[in-house]
Amino acid sequence: MSVQYPPQHSVLLVSSGYDHTIRFWEALSGICSRTIQHADSQVNRLCISPDKKFLAAAGNPHVRLYDINTSSQMPLMTFEGHTNNVTAIAFHCDGKWLATSSEDGTVKVWDMRAPSVQRNYDHKSPVNDLLIHPNQGELLSCDQSGRVRAWDLGENSCTHELIPEEDVPMSSITVGSDGSMLIAGNNKGNCYVWRMLNHQGASLLQPVVKFQAHQRYITRCVLSPDVKHLATCSADATVNIWSTEDMSFMLERRLQGHQRWVWDCAFSADSTYLVTASSDHVARLWELSSGETIRQYSGHHKAAVCVALNDYQI
């Protein structure tokens, strides 16, 4: 059966989770246009490549790379080397390599041309999240012991180790697209904010503020592309939207509608919409100006725990 795919410029939402499927949705119509069976494990995280051609799916213990613009069920590439759940994926801006983190306690850097490990960094604790600094020369990661680490790819070493709350798992980190700030959220619902200063090509991290974002676990924190807002997802079934103006972190809006834990979120490119994934099996598209759900994506029959958005404009 031939499947018709939306044109390149349309908005594509991808969701996945514990039902072993990856679902592609036309974001505006809510139509599921493609389903990939991910038979051997749940999917923990999704990431779309900078050129919008590929989708990386983090499972246990593999990472699989899929072609977004075909109907094939088969991955183009499988990255093998982790020994436990893969928790995060980040693509380098030119797409030549990607980085991953895992509950096996490591951060790995992979060559995209041949799926081999180029770098291996040991956290000595399960790693919960990972990202690439906008300067493309540093990795930032956080772990179950409460540590946030910065890794200099040029020096091939850990340059910062931050421990805001000892033995409180740090669940998520996010960095401003302009490299201005780093934010980490933990299992007590607290967010920690650091100002990022450039010193001779390397980042200096200056503590700014701690605030309680939720009463329960933070599952994900994400800065908007324009760095004007922070979204925090939580076990309390809500998403809070915070203003970053003057590092004030005033609560602007609470997004309510999910029935269970909200695990993941992603902003639209213009920072005006947010997509979320929840244990209630549903993904949602929110208009941030009104706080309203404008589209629901129902199709998963177990928890939806990760989303990715491939958009140019909504």
UniProtKB/Swiss-Prot annotation:
It holds the Pfam family WD40. The keyword Signal does not apply. GO terms for cellular component: cytosol; fungal-type vacuole membrane; nucleus; TORC1 complex; TORC2 complex. Keywords: Cell cycle, Cytoplasm, Meiosis, Nucleus, Phosphoprotein, Repeat, Sporulation, WD repeat. GO terms for biological process: meiotic cell cycle; regulation of actin cytoskeleton organization; sporulation resulting in formation of a cellular spore; TOR signaling; TORC1 signaling; TORC2 signaling. It comes from the Eukaryota. It is found in: Cytoplasm; Nucleus. InterPro entries: G-protein_beta_WD-40_rep, MLST8, WD40/YVTN_repeat-like_dom_sf, WD40_repeat_CS, WD40_repeat_dom_sf, WD40_rpt. The modification Phosphoserine is found at residue 141. WD repeats lie at residues 1-35, 38-76, 81-120, 122-161, 165-204, 213-252, 257-296. PROSITE patterns: WD_REPEATS_1, WD_REPEATS_2, WD_REPEATS_REGION. The target of rapamycin complex 1 (TORC1) is composed of at least mip1, pop3/wat1, tco89, toc1 and tor2. The target of rapamycin complex 2 (TORC2) is composed of at least bit61, pop3/wat1, sin1, ste20 and tor1. Interacts with prp2. Belongs to the WD repeat LST8 family. component of both TORC1 and TORC2, which regulate multiple cellular processes to control cell growth in response to environmental signals. Nutrient limitation and environmental stress signals cause inactivation of TORC1. Active TORC1 positively controls cell growth and ribosome biogenesis by regulating ribosomal protein gene expression. TORC1 negatively controls G1 cell-cycle arrest, sexual development and amino acid uptake. This is Target of rapamycin complex subunit wat1. It comes from Schizosaccharomyces pombe (strain 972 / ATCC 24843).
